[in-house]
Amino acid sequence: MAENGNKIAASDYVNAMKPTHRLGHALQKMFDQYDVLLSPVLASPPVKIGTIKMNTNDMKTYVERLTKYSPFTGIFNQSGQPSMSVPLFRTKDNLPVGSMFSAAFGDENLLFSLAGQLEQAQPWAKSLNVMREILLETI
């Protein structure tokens, strides 16, 4: 990625960012009507570390692999609106399933407040060691 980035002129970068800025403005309009958007974090249950290989220099292949597994997070990574992943559920193998909550620009406090309420209603912190052990089994 870094090598490809060095080949891009500043003017091309500015032009390439215009759709990203339009996306951010469109999402912001949605948040004028809704406080929080809920979506899954991943398109499928979590997999063990090392299952998905991102070892390619082909940017198109990299993006395809990434968006196939995680199609929901990129829009907010790109637009800059705050989001959080909360492990509210588990698979049958006890792996965490993330619920992604997103909010308007500057509404991080809303997400922190929501996270606190969700943690009280369904605590997940105690299961972190179990999750770590399961995810690291293959390393």
Predicted regions and their residues:
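Serine-dependent amide/ester hydrolase catalytic core
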Residues: M1-Q78, V130-E137
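Structural helix-boundary/capping segments
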Residues: Y13-K18, H25, Q33, T67, ...
